[in-house]
């Protein structure tokens, strides 16, 4: 009996151990499921990861491959996505040079049957501009294009298109071979606009320095410029570099505003627009003084241009930048209005170049003031060789 009882006790103990083992396996499996293990055939003892066993280098390689594929896909999307102002350079035929500028060359050409001017800009050509400076200039160019391509007005140069690259652009070589062409650097950009055969207003005025302009022509040019600026301001655009050099004439002497290199959408907060932007002699006092400014800086510059159109002369030809800056801001220096200038026109000049921006008229008001001027009785300056000693004539000071 004792032997039989002992065997039964031993069997019960084995059964209990077996049950305990099964329960442990059940708990372990439940924990494995709860942890969401992805190790597959790994045993329970290997559920804990050891940092010294992890191959971080392999992870880096895989991550780099993944990012490279993602970047390549993104670049493919970007390369196929074109801005609405981008043009097909294959349709552009460049003929010859029109002018040289600070950062590039202007060519005459043909785009899809239209007579055009092509401005090719290469900011790294001099080897001085750093990569950061070149990037900033390219961004500025893109801003110019973004402003220009939306404009449509008879007194604003018509924008045709632009390209942030010039890899497909062929420029005739200076060599004698008619088949020889040059390709600008890939970093270069180009903008294409309508070709205006009359050249710049600046050159037109220089050609008329001695004989001057008829009063009717003075008012016509002034109205063209004022209407163009009024349109820009209605679109919340401040040109910021209004000068006769940035105005072009077509075959019928209609004036059109050009060069939006420093134009920008007007900030709602004037303090967001600061810094010296413009050209010596045309810059408003608040701009010269580094103060916040708005569209009224264009009104000031227009006043200087109006004087220049009437006189066919240039303001402050004998003063340095520092002298002009100081005198305009602190001494209220302005060009001297000839005594023979009609009071109606002289009044517009003075209103436009008032030291207080808030007192300057809006450009649409300037348009109305100019339209009200009677040109039937003359009023322009007499040619210099016909001067009879009138105090309104001064010796020519050159272009």
How would you describe each model-predicted region?
Residues 167-194, 202-203:
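A conserved loop-to-beta-strand element in the N-lobe of protein kinase catalytic cores
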Residues 161-162:
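A short, aromatic-enriched beta-strand patch in the conserved N-lobe beta-sheet
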Residues 298:
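Conserved catalytic-loop aspartate of Hanks-type protein kinases
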Residues 95-106:
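Protein kinase glycine-rich loop
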């Amino acid at each position: 009996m004792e032997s039989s009882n002992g065997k039964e006790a031993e069997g019960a103990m084995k059964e209990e151990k077996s049950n305990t083992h099964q329960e442990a396996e059940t708990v372990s499996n439940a924990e494995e499921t709860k942890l969401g293990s992805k190790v597959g055939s790994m045993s329970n003892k290997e559920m804990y990861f050891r940092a010294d066993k992890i191959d971080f280098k392999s992870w880096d390689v895989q991550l780099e491959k993944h990012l490279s594929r993602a970047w390549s896909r993104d670049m493919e999307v970007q390369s196929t996505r074109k801005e609405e102002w981008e043009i097909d350079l294959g349709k552009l035929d460049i003929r010859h040079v029109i002018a040289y500028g600070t950062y590039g060359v202007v060519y005459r050409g043909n785009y899809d049957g239209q007579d055009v001017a092509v401005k090719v800009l290469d900011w790294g050509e001099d080897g001085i501009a750093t990569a950061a400076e070149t990037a900033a200039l390219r961004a500025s160019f893109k801003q110019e294009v973004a402003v220009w391509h939306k404009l449509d007005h008879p007194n604003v140069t018509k924008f045709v298109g632009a390209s942030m690259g010039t890899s497909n652009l062929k420029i005739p070589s200076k060599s004698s071979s008619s088949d020889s062409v040059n390709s600008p650097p890939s970093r270069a950009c180009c903008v294409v606009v309508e070709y205006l055969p009359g050249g710049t207003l600046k050159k037109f005025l220089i050609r008329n320095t001695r004989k001057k302009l008829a009063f009717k022509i003075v008012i016509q040019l002034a109205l063209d410029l004022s209407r163009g600026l009024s349109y820009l301001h209605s679109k919340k655009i401040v040109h910021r570099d209004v000068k006769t050099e940035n105005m072009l004439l077509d075959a019928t002497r209609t004036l059109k505003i050009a060069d939006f290199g420093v134009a920008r959408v007007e900030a709602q907060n004037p303090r967001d627009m600061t810094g010296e932007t413009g050209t010596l002699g045309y810059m408003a006092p608040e701009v010269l003084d580094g103060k916040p400014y708005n569209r009224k800086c264009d009104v000031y510059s227009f006043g200087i241009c109006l004087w220049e159109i009437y006189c066919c002369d240039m303001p402050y030809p004998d003063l340095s930048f520092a002298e002009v800056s100081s005198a305009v801001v602190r001494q209220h220096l302005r060009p001297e209005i000839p005594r023979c200038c009609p009071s109606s026109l002289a009044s517009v000049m003075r209103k436009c170049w008032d030291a207080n921006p808030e007192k300057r008229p809006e450009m649409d008001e300037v348009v109305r003031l100019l339209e009200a001027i009677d040109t039937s009785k003359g009023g322009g300056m007499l040619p210099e060789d016909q001067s009879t000693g009138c105090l309104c004539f001064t010796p020519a000071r050159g272009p």
